[in-house]
């Protein structure tokens, strides 16, 4: 068996394969996840990603200042803020993961607890929006953050990946 390094060194005259879109879902395609019934979730997803990206960028700047490593900024009153922002980011990531569960679109498409699925999608979206709105404040209120950290607490390690 060739290693990745061996494969990279070999000439590029091998067959080129292009994967096709397929799914274990109905008909072998993505109709369950890409149809008019569930299309509403995609703009929501992209807005959540944009909020995550913005907060991550802000977090990087604040974390650099607090560590004293960025532009010679001394450690000081902002030292606690990066930890709080990281908690907000971690919970937003959890909410985003829960939002992306393929079950919701499946349930809506099959009209199997569709209202529950829509409620869950809307709930996770609203959670991300509320967390973001609070996280960008100079002195964020962590009440909602604490509540959601208890309620939607999957992947406790997710903050380490940010």
Where are the model-predicted features located?
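Active-site and substrate-binding clefts of carbohydrate-active enzymes
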Residues: 1-68, 72, 76-162
């Amino acid at each position: 068996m060739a290693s990745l390094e061996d494969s990279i060194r070999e000439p590029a005259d091998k067959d080129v394969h292009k994967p096709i879109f397929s799914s274990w879902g109905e008909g072998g395609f993505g109709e369950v996840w890409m149809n008019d019934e569930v299309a509403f979730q995609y703009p929501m997803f992209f807005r959540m990603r944009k909020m995550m990206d913005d907060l991550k960028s802000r977090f990087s700047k604040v974390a650099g200042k607090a560590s004293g490593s960025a532009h010679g900024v001394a450690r000081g009153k902002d030292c606690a803020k990066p930890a709080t922002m990281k908690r907000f980011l971690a919970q937003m990531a959890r909410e985003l993961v829960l939002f992306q569960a393929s079950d919701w679109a499946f349930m809506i498409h099959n009209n199997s607890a569709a209202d529950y699925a829509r409620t869950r999608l809307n709930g996770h979206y609203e959670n991300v929006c509320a967390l973001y709105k609070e996280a960008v404040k100079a002195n964020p209120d962590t009440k909602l953050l604490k509540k959601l950290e208890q309620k939607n607490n999957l992947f406790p390690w997710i903050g380490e990946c940010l």
